[in-house]
C-alpha cells in the first residue's frame, strides 16, 4: 500500500496491483484509458474522479503505480 498526497491535501491510498488487475485492463487498447482504469481500481476511485485530477496529481499516481511494477 502506498499513500499519495494530492495537491489539494487529499491523501489517496493505492494498493499493490495483482496479476488479475493487469488482466482486467489488458483488453483496453488505449494506453491512457488503460492507466486510468487501473488507477481507479487500485485507488478505489471512479474513472471520473481520475479524469478530474490535475495533470500533476495524475502523474503522482502514475509514478506510484510504476514503482509497484518495477
Where are these regions (language model features)?
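Short, surface-exposed, charged amphipathic helix/loop patches that serve as local interaction elements
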Residues: 1-70
